[in-house]
């Protein structure tokens, strides 16, 4: 059965939607994130709303069900990055249907107007599946592994992707 994927930018009034998908992600894939379910489950409405002040949150839905998420933060980053992408996750029930490709397509359509032309991200060095998925989207590894400040003993790899207009 074909899937209808819809990508939207969430706004602060949709903080519950962000919270719900983020907590699902932390329960499903705790190894993939710097944060923890235990800590983020304790955040109140004000703390969730504050996150919207510094980051743009994107959610992809499949036939009306929130199935993937990411955030984008504008910054002057390593290797010329104009933004940093993080918090990428897709629901295991919907993996393989093109959610990440759809969300990066959503970003690319706005890249010029929002200064998202050179996208950077960090991925744990032991997350081979995510690294391969990002490479399929055009990301390349840059620099060597970096020590995590949020999870001592873990290392992440920086990856960069330039959009067609960069």
Identify the residue ranges that each predicted region occupies:
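Acetyl-CoA-dependent GNAT
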Residues: 12-93, 104-106, 110, 145, ...
